[in-house]
């Protein structure tokens, strides 16, 4: 027959210590300082990326704010970003930060200029293309981006129902404007 007496005494002693510690905490004799939440402060989603049949929402700082089962219609989709994993409530660690920076700059300009752009694609060589309806908008590299987006706002309503390619990579000769080729 095994002796259980010492084990029971140890368990009882531990229980008494736990009760004493809880009493000291509850009465305020011992104060516990809790570590603040280390997750980033999440803000309103401004874009989304598609990932494993889900639509992951991103804020302006590339924090993943949530996920949806269907594609949002009020914010643009961002494509061209490379990453290993995605965790809701965490910052999206991209392999090419400059590509992500340019993509989010375009997203910011889309919102500032109240444009209805469906998708923003930035390639590894940092050239951007945006899509809306049947229009492909070639933005090129991050050069005069804010000015280009402001120009787009000025004539967006005139072209948004068309089908073709709007080349905004640079102004045409003699600064007459951007070129548009219908399909």
Per-region residue spans from a language model:
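Charged, solvent-exposed interaction patches on well-folded alpha/beta domains
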Residues: 2-183
């Amino acid at each position: 027959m095994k002796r259980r007496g010492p084990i029971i005494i140890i368990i009882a002693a531990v229980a008494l210590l736990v009760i004493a510690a809880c009493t000291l905490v509850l009465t305020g004799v011992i104060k516990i300082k809790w570590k603040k939440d280390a997750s980033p402060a999440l803000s309103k989603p401004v874009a989304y990326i598609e990932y494993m049949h889900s639509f992951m929402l991103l804020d302006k700082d590339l924090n993943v704010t949530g996920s949806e089962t269907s594609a949002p219609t009020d914010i643009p989709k961002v494509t061209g970003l490379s990453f290993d994993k995605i965790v809701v409530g965490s910052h999206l660690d991209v392999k090419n930060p400059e590509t992500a920076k340019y993509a989010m700059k375009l997203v910011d300009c889309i919102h500032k200029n109240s444009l209805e752009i469906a998708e923003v694609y930035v390639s590894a060589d940092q050239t951007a293309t945006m899509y809306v309806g049947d229009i492909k908008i070639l933005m090129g590299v991050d050069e005069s981006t804010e000015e280009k987006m402001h120009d787009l706002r000025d004539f967006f309503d005139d072209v948004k129902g068309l089908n073709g390619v709007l080349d905004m990579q640079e102004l045409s000769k003699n600064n007459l404007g951007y070129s548009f080729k219908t399909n």
